[in-house]
Amino acid sequence: MIHGNGGSIRAFSHNIPYFATKYHVIAADSRAQGKSKDPGPTLTFETMADDEAALLDTLHIKAAYVLGWSDGGIVAIELAMRHPDKVIKLAATGANVQPDASAFRPGLWDGWKKQYDADKNKIWKTDEERNRWKLFMLDWNQPNIPFDALHAIACPCLIICGDHDLISIEHTVKIFQNIPNAELWVVPSSGHATLIQHADEFNKTVDEFFSSPTSRRASKP
C-alpha cells in the first residue's frame, strides 16, 4: 500500500485491517514523509517507485498486489512501468499522470499556482519548511507520463476516482483508456478519499479485483 503526498501508512487505517485477513500487507512511509527521512533537495516519482521495488527485494518478495492512493497511485503506476515483474495487479485511486490544469478539477490548479507564485522565491529556514516545499514541488512539476507510455503496463489495473475527486474524471478515463488491461471505477458520491469515504465498498471491490482469476476491460457502474 502506497500513501499520498505528505501522508503516512496511517492513511490506510480503514483498509489494512480488512486486507490483513487475506494478504500479507506491506505498508511503508514514503521518503520525506511520515517517519521516513530524505535529505535530498528534490523528489521524483521514479525514485519512489524504485524504493518500492527495493523494499520488495529486501523482504524477498518476488511480486505483489499494489494499491496506491493519490501520489501513491502515481508511484504504483511508475512501479508497474519500471519494474513490471514486481506487480501482479495494480489498483490506483486518485492518480494523475500530468501535473498541469488538465488533470484536475476546474479551478483547483489555479489555487496551487497562486501558492507557487507566492512562495517560489522564499528562503526556507527550517528542515520542516524545506521538506514541505519539496513535497509541494513534487506535485507541481510531476508526474510527466505521456498517455501513450501507459501502453507498456502489462499487469491488470483497476483505475479509480471519486465522482467529485480532485483529479478530473476525464483525466482518469484517459489513464484507463491507455492501459491495455484495465478496469475503471468511478465511485459515486465520493471525493479524493475514496478508500476512506467508502471504505467497506472500496475494500471489497479492490479485493474482488485482486482475487479474480482474470481481468476484463470494463467499467464498474
Roles of regions detected by a PLM:
Residues 133-149, 155:
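Active-site nucleophile elbow and catalytic-triad environment of alpha/beta-hydrolase enzymes
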